[in-house]
């Protein structure tokens, strides 16, 4: 009986620790089309600096890091970097914390020709 209680406590503690690691989730990007140098605003949840360490634009083969100009829990602003090629690109985050992960987000932006 005591053993099952201890196991239950350990499981509850591990689930609580896991739940505290909030995962970033992007829900929209404005504008949906842009050119190099344009400012882009991404909205979502858990976008603060401790959960989103870096932000990339990716076509699935080439990842281009963007320079974040403003960042809060619900919004990230960045400029489209000169290295971006025209096309439809996904946003991808590098999470913060002890075990960083690259996570492609369900939002995309189209980079137009100059």
Regions found by a protein language model. Name each.
Residues 1-5:
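Positively charged n-region of N-terminal signal peptides that target proteins for export
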Residues 10-19:
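Hydrophobic h-region of N-terminal signal peptides that target proteins for export
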Residues 20-114:
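Ser/Thr/Pro-rich low-complexity tracts
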């Amino acid at each position: 009986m005591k053993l099952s209680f201890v196991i239950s406590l350990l499981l509850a503690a591990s689930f609580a620790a896991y739940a505290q690691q909030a995962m970033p989730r992007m829900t929209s990007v404005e504008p949906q089309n842009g050119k190099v140098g344009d400012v882009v605003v991404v909205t979502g949840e858990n976008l603060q600096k401790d959960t989103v360490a870096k932000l990339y634009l990716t076509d699935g083969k080439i990842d281009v890091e963007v320079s974040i100009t403003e960042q809060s829990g619900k919004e990230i602003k960045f400029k489209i970097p000169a290295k971006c090629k025209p096309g439809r690109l996904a946003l991808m985050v590098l999470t913060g914390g002890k075990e960083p992960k690259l996570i492609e987000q369900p939002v995309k932006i189209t980079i137009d020709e100059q």
